[in-house]
């Protein structure tokens, strides 16, 4: 009797426990609730994107040192197709207005009759591969203006029905072309190691750069950095700004005499920037602060006809975090400044000296560092 009682009691307890469990589950279960499935909407799509084939860059600067420049345009896919699929590439002249507006630039369209695509621009991605390339040739022309940047916006068109294009950025890549045929004294060939010369602006004439030549007559130095202007806090405006000491400003004011002769020989001239013992710094700007400072740097390069900038993260004090233009020092903040600078002047060089927080982040907003840093100058101690 006792055993029967215990078994019956255990069975009753299990029923009560199971009922409680089911009741508890019912409290958490919402039948018929709408679920946001937008995150899964593209899982079956095969998204295409466009790049320069040689560099794998979305935005590629091309310097014409000869009569022709050859490269390839690459279309990549997010998935491997089961069967061959295809698309075409073409020049999308209308897109240039959108691009110029986004970057606050005024690039002119490169003469379309000087650009040709092999195979009528048709790209065929074979089964079990994820990309295809087509040759593109850019020819020089008599009407090109020196010291002017032209743009070639290339777009995907006539794609097969199984190819999806996510947005305009994925659909396009752009070539920024400069005629350098008469400014080739420093050019030693594509992909050749370049020499960077940092010189102290307080007591050195930049034209001394032209005194150094190789045995073949080519100039030794490819890039000259004016070392250096500063980032400083503008108390009246309440934001960081570019500050030039009298010697830097003298070179800028007399750039036709002291700087442009270098550029006419093919030497790139960059404005060096570093901290200057106050609350601002190149690696401690907020996102908005970086955008504002980058736009000012771009205006300096445009106004004084310079080839870009070199950032050096030194000599900055702790930031005032109550200022919306500033943030804690970090490699992420430094990367943001480089990214925003490239956005503001895509045809110019954005370079950094590998010191402090100035280098070490791989992407900003999903964009690879090679798109917004052109050169990292190593610290040799």
Predicted feature residues:
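C-terminal motif of bacterial Sec signal peptides marking the signal peptidase cleavage site
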Residues: 20-24
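Bacterial N-terminal signal peptides that target proteins for export
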Residues: 1-11
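Acidic/polar, low-complexity intrinsically disordered N-terminal segments immediately downstream
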Residues: 26-218
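Short intrinsically disordered, low-complexity segments
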Residues: 16-17, 136, 276
